[in-house]
């Protein structure tokens, strides 16, 4: 077995810890520093960075197992900050922000919590961008290339992240971006049933980062009509109409989803086979949408952006990439390898000689 790439330092803690909440989600919240483990263990640092604790009311062992595999990949520290160890957190929580976390606040007396520990990798892409839109525009293409390189690395090892969005990309003090939160990760080769994807069931039109094919299959499973689904998707998110206006020559959302529902074998086995073939493209949609949204923010909110070098000299190739990666039809969606080839002339990691951690 490969050596642990982190060698996190564990010390015996005394007194109150006290950690600030960094983020919250459906299954739990993250705190910095990591809360105390039951029995008194305290994770102070991981890979030379402060330890962050992700506390959940669900079992995190699967996420940690995948995290260790992800972090054993070449150049992993430059692209990922995955959880690599876990413990049962000490309760009651002494962290002052614990009361702001609904999962902790609303838990029953017999709730069992788990905590995954990962290195602090900065602030979310959303907050980092909002803090300085000019800085974000100046580093946009380098950031995009770096994230594409990371995707090539983990997908080349057979993984799909399955939860890429603005909140699961962190940017550190040097402007290096890393993917976090591999809790929904899966391997397409292992998909035999829908539940192997770990994305649940039930049509959820508010989840714009879910690829159109996921919405289409959930419509089928819930026995909703395509017309109903399209109306709900468009009502919840303006991105679909904006993408159709920006890229008018490609298939519309209605055409793409309709073709999927007509041509795919709509059984548990049929949907699983489709995802074995096209599951990696869920991430292609997600990163394309992230970076397209950021580009649109520049166009809308950054004065003088259309006079910038990025806009005048790189807009053409960037639109090809963004349009390709946000194709509604996964069969023609652009891969990160193809995107890197267009942007840099290379196909893999190291295209921009990223900062080494």
Question: For each predicted feature, which ranges?
Answer:
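C-lobe/activation-segment region of protein kinase-like
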Residues: 177-302
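A conserved short helix/loop substructure at the end of the activation segment
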Residues: 324-339
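Conserved C-terminal C-lobe helix
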Residues: 313-327
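Juxta-kinase regulatory segment immediately upstream of eukaryotic protein kinase catalytic domains
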Residues: 1-21, 37
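Conserved structural core of kinase catalytic domains
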Residues: 78-140
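ATP-binding glycine-rich loop module of kinase domains
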Residues: 24-97
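Catalytic-loop of the protein kinase fold
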Residues: 154-172
């Amino acid at each position: 077995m490969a050596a642990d790439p982190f060698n996190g330092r564990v010390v015996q803690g005394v007194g109150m810890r006290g950690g600030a909440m960094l983020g919250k989600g459906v299954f739990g919240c993250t705190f910095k520093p990591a809360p105390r483990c039951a029995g008194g263990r305290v994770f102070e640092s991981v890979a030379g960075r402060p330890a962050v604790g992700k506390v959940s009311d669900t079992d995190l062992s699967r996420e940690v197992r995948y995290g260790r595999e992800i972090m054993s990949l070449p150049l992993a520290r430059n692209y990922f900050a995955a959880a690599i160890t876990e413990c049962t957190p000490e309760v009651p929580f002494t962290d002052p922000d614990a009361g702001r976390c609904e999962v902790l606040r609303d838990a029953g007396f017999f709730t069992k919590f788990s905590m995954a520990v990962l290195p602090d990798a900065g602030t979310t892409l959303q907050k980092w961008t909002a803090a300085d839109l000019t800085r974000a525009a100046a580093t946009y293409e380098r950031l995009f290339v770096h994230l594409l390189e990371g995707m090539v690395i983990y997908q080349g090892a057979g993984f799909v992240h399955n939860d890429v969005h603005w909140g699961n990309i962190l940017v550190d003090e040097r402007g290096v971006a890393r993917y976090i939160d591999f809790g929904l990760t899966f391997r397409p080769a292992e998909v035999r049933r829908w539940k192997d994807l770990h994305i649940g069931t039930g049509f959820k039109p508010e989840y714009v980062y879910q690829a159109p094919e996921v919405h289409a299959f959930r419509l089928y499973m819930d026995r909703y009509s395509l017309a109903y689904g399209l109306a709900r998707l468009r009502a919840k998110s303006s991105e679909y109409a904006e993408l159709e206006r920006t890229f008018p020559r490609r298939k519309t959302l209605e055409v793409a989803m309709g073709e999927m529902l007509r041509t795919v074998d709509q059984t548990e086995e049929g949907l699983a086979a489709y995802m074995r073939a096209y599951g990696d493209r869920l991430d292609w949609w997600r990163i394309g949408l992230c970076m397209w949204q950021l580009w649109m923010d520049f166009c809308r909110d950054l004065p003088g952006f259309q006079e910038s070098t990025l806009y005048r000299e790189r807009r053409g190739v960037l639109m090809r990439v963004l349009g390709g990666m946000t194709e509604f039809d996964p069969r023609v969606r652009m891969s990160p390898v193809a995107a890197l080839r267009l942007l840099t002339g290379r196909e893999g990691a190291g295209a921009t000689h990223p900062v080494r951690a």
